[in-house]
From Swiss-Prot:
Its main location: secreted. Residues 39-163 form the C-type lectin domain. Antifreeze proteins lower the blood freezing point. GO terms for cellular component: extracellular region. This is Type-2 ice-structuring protein. It is found in: Secreted.
Length: 163
């Protein structure tokens, strides 16, 4: 009985110590994803949630832009929320390639990084859904909506990598 009482007292003391750390903000237990520190992005990249974003100023085709992003450790940017869309808008001084494409099947838009396309910001009459225009760009229009363009066009691009 004495042993059980000692164990209970020890557990209460440890629980109290951990509660004190939480109240003081010194607890080391991992918190939810939204409370994680931003990733340490490579030079030239900017943190956005659990990802790093890079604005590539050299104009190139969609395929070369994707290859370039992969060489840098990422993909052309996928966009999953209005927050991400707005952030990328702040980087964009004109038309840029982002990671959407429908080149395998007209109208079947996917992100090059394989993530689900759960957010959309198409321009009002887009996409055209023709294979000749199967790569996605963010326009230079006021709302910087998405448009489908022929992939051989040369534009700047936005890369993203996840940590």
């Amino acid at each position: 009985m004495l042993t059980v009482s000692l164990l209970v007292c020890a557990m209460m003391a440890l629980t109290q110590a951990n509660d004190d750390k939480i109240l003081k903000g010194t607890a080391t237990e991992a918190g939810p994803v939204s409370q994680r520190a931003p990733p340490n992005c490579p030079a030239g990249w900017q943190p956005l949630g659990d990802r790093c974003i890079y604005y590539e100023t050299t104009a190139m085709t969609w395929a070369l832009a994707e290859t370039n992003c992969m060489k840098l450790g990422g993909h052309l940017a996928s966009i999953h929320s209005q927050e991400e869309h707005s952030f990328i808008q702040t980087l964009n001084a004109g038309v840029v390639w982002i990671g959407g494409s429908a080149c395998l099947q007209a109208g079947a838009w996917t992100w090059s990084d394989g993530t689900p396309m759960n957010f959309r910001s198409w321009c009002s009459t887009k996409p055209d859904d023709v294979l000749a225009a199967c790569c996605m760009q963010m326009t230079a229009a006021a709302d910087q909506c998405w448009d489908d363009l022929p992939c051989p066009a040369s534009h700047k691009s936005v890369c993203a990598m996840t940590f």
